[in-house]
UniProtKB/Swiss-Prot annotation:
SUPFAM superfamilies per record: Winged helix' DNA-binding domain (SSF46785)
A Pfam family reported for this protein in Swiss-Prot or TrEMBL: MarR
PANTHER family associated with the record: TRANSCRIPTIONAL REGULATOR, MARR, TRANSCRIPTIONAL REPRESSOR OF EMRAB OPERON
Protein name: Uncharacterized HTH-type transcriptional regulator YdgJ
DNA-binding region range list: 71-94
Alphabetic keyword roster: DNA-binding, Transcription, Transcription regulation
Superkingdom field: Bacteria
Domain HTH marR-type: 28-157
Single Gene Ontology MF annotation: DNA binding
Organism classification: Bacteria, Bacillati, Bacillota, Bacilli, Bacillales
InterPro entries: ArsR-like_HTH, HTH_ArsR_DNA-bd_dom, HTH_MarR-typ, WH-like_DNA-bd_sf, WH_DNA-bd_sf
The organism of origin for this protein: Bacillus subtilis (strain 168)
Length: 164
């Protein structure tokens, strides 16, 4: 039984969330659960507010700053598996936001570019994204934001250095 499932069962039984967390989980476990909780809701809320997933918006943003790029290079930049990139690009292509074509010199390479409609979508998404971020970070001071950036960067580095 994980600490999280134990917590859930104890909360149901006792109705005392704060007491349960303090009594049965380490601070490190609480950090992990809070990060997992944020990760679960941020994508859903972001898409609800902006009308586009974070992954697709990231792809469009990269294409916004590139004239044309190979699909494999795009995949490396976003660090999403190639099957997911293909699915995202197919969906974006069906909505007229990107176009794909085979490279004439090497038919194995697919080139991707942003369409005018995709460029307009990026520009309109900027305001929606800013509003989402502003609401997400409400009640978080500038100093706390800088600290959060630093802590999350160090945690990400630590995670990357964990040997699996």
């Amino acid at each position: 039984m994980t600490c999280q499932s134990l917590i859930y069962q104890l909360i149901v039984l006792t109705g005392k969330k704060g007491w349960v967390l303090a009594s049965f989980c380490s601070e490190e476990a609480e950090i992990l659960y809070q990060l997992q909780g944020v990760n679960k809701v941020i994508g859903v809320k972001f898409e609800a507010c902006t009308g586009i997933s974070q992954s697709r918006l990231e792809l469009l943003t990269l294409l916004y700053h590139a004239d044309e790029i190979s699909q494999s290079d795009l995949q490396k930049k976003v660090n999403i598996d190639s099957a997911a990139v293909t699915r995202h690009l197919k969906q974006l292509e069906s909505k007229g936001m990107v176009s794909r074509r085979r490279k004439p010199e090497d038919n194995r390479i697919t080139l991707v570019r942003l369409t005018d409609q995709g460029r307009e979508r990026i520009e309109s998404s900027k305001k929606e994204k800013e509003r989402f971020m502003k609401e997400m970070l409400a009640n978080v001071s500038a100093e706390e934001r800088r600290l959060l950036i630093d802590v999350l960067a160090r945690m990400r580095n630590n995670i990357n250095n964990i040997e699996a």
